[in-house]
Design a protein with these regions (language model features):
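ABC-family P-loop ATPase nucleotide-binding domain
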Residues: 1-19, 227-232
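H-loop (His-switch) and adjacent beta-strand-loop-beta switch element
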Residues: 218-230
């Protein structure tokens, strides 16, 4: 059995396998992954399409249960938690920023950040939402709806939504994929700055080698395996 994660390791995974598709002939998308990630570090996941990057993120973030192996996140064995307990564990520990912004069009920027926290029973949800939106440079857009915001501004709202609950772990899956080069650089500057201010561990999925080199560690996947693990 995997030893409990130490204070220095926010993620500890051993023998993680994920099989998807037909039970009679499943597709192995992760093949015995062993991985530890230090608390407060920044890690890039590289690899071609189909290499297992998004699947690994899904397992590490609790969105998907591993077929075999063990994943400890902040000392908790996600595989041993029932659905409700897993949802509670993820809520306080994990933030996710995706390529698609996934903002609700009928809610203002503030509401898009605050309402998920409010539904989770968080105190001062709207005050925290406003503070985080100020921090990402959107203090003048608090009452704007997504349709009134540029792509870069919408991604800033998504970053604020992910960081406002103060997660220990922040996952970003191709967060600049829908943005032009200049806006993408600005958003990544912001993402790195805000995660550092929050003390969160950052795991970024990207095809962009330049973005990967901004992280402290680069892990390359191929065919469901880690094929390279190096300092940036």
């Amino acid at each position: 059995m995997l030893a409990p994660a130490t204070n220095d390791m926010v993620i500890a995974a051993r023998g993680v396998t994920l099989a998807l598709g037909d039970a009679a002939a499943p597709t192995q998308v992760l093949r015995g992954i062993d991985l530890e990630i230090a608390r407060g570090s920044s890690v890039a996941l590289l690899g071609p399409s189909g290499s297992g990057k998004s699947s690994l993120m899904a397992v590490l973030s609790g969105l998907e249960q591993a077929t075999a192996g063990q994943v400890l996140v902040d000392g908790l064995d996600f595989g041993r938690l029932d659905e409700d307990a897993l949802a509670r564990a993820r809520r306080g520990r994990i933030g996710i920023v995706l390529q698609a912004f996934h903002l609700l069009p009928t809610m203002t920027a503030t509401e898009n950040v605050a309402v998920p926290m409010e539904l989770a029973g968080e105190r001062d949800a709207f005050a925290r939402a406003r503070a985080e939106l100020e921090a990402v440079g959107l203090g003048h857009r608090l009452t704007h709806y997504p349709a009134q915001l540029s792509g870069g501004e919408q991604q800033r709202v998504a970053i604020a939504r992910a960081l406002a609950p103060r997660p220990a772990l922040l996952f970003a899956d191709e967060p600049t994929g829908n943005l032009d080069a200049r806006t993408g650089t600005e958003v990544m500057d912001l993402l790195f700055a805000r995660r550092e201010a929050a003390g969160a561990t950052l795991i970024v999925i990207t095809h962009d080698a330049r973005l990967a080199e901004r992280c402290e560690r680069v892990i390359t996947l191929g065919d469901g395996l880690i094929v390279e693990d190096r300092a940036a």
